[in-house]
Swiss-Prot record:
CDD domains: PoNe_Nuclease. InterPro entries: Restrct_endonuc-II-like (IPR011335), tRNA_endonuc-like_dom_sf (IPR011856), UPF0102_YraN-like (IPR003509). Coiled coil: none annotated. SUPFAM superfamilies: Restriction endonuclease-like. This is UPF0102 protein MCA0184. One of its GO terms (molecular function) is nucleic acid binding.
């Protein structure tokens, strides 16, 4: 997703849309955006083959506070896991699942992504 030729910072929804396109171009299939329940929100629910993939999109326009990945702390991980488990129960998911994080940051030629597969594991 090009942001109309400018190098303006993305908004959260733009970063999520850009990430959905980025992952789709790499073989994943979008199932749902912004799944919400009382426990939290999952930005993207996708599939890679038979594996259900929950995707947390993090965007920071700079590294002042450690960048996008630094914003995924222990509390955020617990909320994401709980929300993913809620989705799995609600949708009767029994197959393989994983939780990925995509950190989006501005680059000279447009957004850049750091995709971490299976970034968050249940303890």
């Amino acid at each position: 997703m090009a942001v109309s030729g400018s190098h303006r910072p993305l908004t959260g929804p733009q970063a999520e849309s850009w990430t959905a396109e980025y992952l789709t171009a790499r073989g994943l299939r979008l199932i749902e955006r912004n799944y919400r329940c009382r426990l939290g929100e999952i930005d993207l629910v996708m599939a890679e083959g038979a594996t259900l993939v929950f995707v947390e999109v993090r965007y920071r326009s700079g590294k002042r506070y450690g960048g996008a990945l630094a914003s995924v702390d222990r509390h955020k991980c617990r909320r994401l896991l709980a929300t993913a488990q809620h989705y799995m129960v609600e949708h009767r998911v029994t197959g393989a699942v994983r939780l990925d994080v995509v950190a989006v940051s501005p680059g000279a030629a447009g957004p850049q992504a750091e995709w971490i597969r299976n970034a968050i594991e249940a303890q």
